[in-house]
Amino acid sequence: MHNKLYLFILSLFVAISAAAQNIEITVKLGNEPAEYAFIFKNGCCLGNCDSLGRFEFQAGAIERGDSLMASVAGLSSDVVVYDGNARSVTLNVKSGELAGAKVVEKNLKRVDEYVSLVNSVPFEWRVFGRRFLCEYVIGEDSEISRKTADFTILDNYGKRYSKDKGDVLIYSFGNNIDDEKVGYDIFSSYVILGKILNRHSERLKDECTSGRMLVHKLSDDAGISYLLIDKSGDNSQILVRFGYRKELLDVCLEGNRNEEYGLEHYVWKITIAQNRKGPVRISGIELHGNMIATGKPKDVLVSEINDSPLTKADWKELKMAFVR
């Protein structure tokens, strides 16, 4: 009996000692925790924080001289060099570019992330074709005008709005902004969706290749990417990449929490300067293309894709869901 008690106390002591050696990283965006911010050690992304902005390194996983940085919504913290002794480190993400934006749609559980456009007009990025309300600001200092818009994200199959005829996403405001023209310059943006789901890749591959969810097709240096809308009712969005030999490269999902696949709610966004050339890669995913915002409401262009297995009924359902 005494031996069992001794072993229990010893194991408890070892567990407490091991936990005490862990290093906790806290990421803040202003005075608030930066939900699901990404943590970088020596330039490599190790994962993301929890909903309280916390990330924990196991004992020995970080050493003196390692550089730490956090990133969320295209914004980054200053680089902090670990001194080898601290048990906790706080990384502060600069939030100056995010002022003034707030999503007011009632069924959103939280404001995920913002993308800062040119002229510092932030907005919330959501699923293609989904409408929601967004507060935004235009102007600077005393000339700031705060508006609330019915905001729709549209895709552009026709490529008619792109100067270089590349893939373009159209962001369109609705009619409830007093017909004011709200437009921005074309800017480069790489939108990275989801979290790599290798453990579910084969299961999703069967659904994706059946074409039941196929909506958008992208080409890049790695092969073909398919952007899919899950028609099961949870408004999810899946990005699947296949190589030239039709081998599966990546599977990612953005949308509501999906218990069936055990998926968290992730949206990765990176906005880069116009003069940036080459793809941005995060965890093996990359997208190429430009985006433009326009003040004129436009329809989603849902067009046939070559060799698409979608039936006429599928296309009819897609058009009813996305064409306004």
Can you annotate each of these PLM segments?
Residues 30-31, 37-47, 73, 103-108:
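Short amphipathic beta-strand segments in non-cytosolic proteins
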Residues 87-227, 232-233, 239-324:
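Surface-exposed, low-complexity/disordered segments
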Residues 21-35:
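Structural motif
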Residues 69-81:
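A short, solvent-exposed loop/turn motif at the edges and junctions
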Residues 7-17:
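Bacterial N-terminal signal peptides
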Residues 44-56:
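Short, acidic Ser/Thr/Gly-rich low-complexity loop/linker segments typical of extracellular
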Residues 56-65:
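Short Pro-Gly-centered beta-turn/loop motif in secreted/extracellular proteins
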